[in-house]
Every structure is written in C-alpha cells, then in structure tokens.
C-alpha cells in the first residue's frame, strides 16, 4: 500500500498500488496521512519525498470505491480519509518533494500544490479530470493552482480535463525540474540530500514563514470546493461518468 524507506535523513514514501495505478482508496489516504504525521515528529527525518511504484505516480481517487461510497458512505471509511490527508499535507512542517514518475490524475496532480519542490519524468503526464467526471475541483486546487501557474493556465487545467505534458508542466511552473525517466529518483534524491544536510529547525522555519499565511486560504478553498462537490457528486453527469468507468473496467478484466 505504502512503502517507507530512509536514507540520509530523507524519508521516501512510495505509493504502492501499481495494479490500480496507485489510486488513492481510504486505506492509502490513511497510510499517507499517518506516514506524514510520523515523519513530522521524527527528529531524524529532514525531508520527505513522495513517489509512485510502477508506471504511475497516482491515478487519483479510486473511482470504484468512490461509486460504492455514494450508496454506502461508511462502507470504506478510514481513520483519516481524504480531508484529513489534506490537513496533514497543508500543515506538514518539513520540506516535501514530489517525484512524479508516471501519470498523475486528480489528487495525483493536485498534490503538487503542497510540494515545496516537484520533479517530473519527461514521459509523465498530469490531468485534473473534474469536469469530465462532472464534479468540482479538490484539494484547494482552485486556490493553489492559480498561484502556481497563473489564472489562465489554472483555468485550462481545471476546466478542460486535458492531459498536461511534462514540458508544459515545467513551462507553467507546476513542476521545478523535468528529468529523464531513469534519472528521476536519483536527481530528486540528490536535491533532497542537499536540503537534508541543513539544520532541521532552520528548514522548518523557512517553510513555516512561507506557508503559514496560506493556511486560512487553503482551508477556505477546500470548504468552497467541498460544498460544490457535495452538490455534484451522484448527480446525473457524475453518475454517468462513474458508471462508464466501472463498465469499462469490468469489460477489460
């Protein structure tokens, strides 16, 4: 589900549901949130890297579980869940680096808004498929994306549900560096080790002063998005999209 490894004060969290393209189900939300909480409190961890196993970074929310949750909301409920994971990401006090090794969809793309540095494989792609699923944005992306990439780029990403290439993500400022696939993790960890060599209290002070002013705005954006999401989830467009996804998945098995 989630692999955790340490090297030179750098903790790497590897999303490990490769058969599901590392889609987030309740168990993975829980594992990721708990791993971040543990890393935040560990005096031997200076930097956290998040990456994915296999050919995907993360395919986003597990749509099969999402459809099941519409009819039975408590069936797959976890300890932390999606929103608690967002709280933990927003409050994470140490440098957080994402290494996008493959496709990143939904939260697999919007999680980059919480990264202090993002590296991306040259053959990876990103997508925010909210309009194709008939739902609203998530993870404060309606606030964080315009800050990262500008209003018009953010509008295109969030409204079009189109793929964004690594080159486009770099040009927009959504990621910091694009690497060859075979060099992604090495390059990510090389930079992570530079940060990890610095005093942890100083790293945390830099991050706090940069991110503390954003926390209330992130919380407000999530509240707005959640209200819109609640209106749209299970509505005609969303139900049709989820049904099509489930039918397609079953026909491919």
Description of each model-found segment:
Residues 52-88, 104, 132, 217, ...:
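Glycine- (often His-adjacent) and acidic-residue-rich active-site loop
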Residues 7, 42, 92-93, 235:
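Acidic-histidine catalytic/liganding microenvironments
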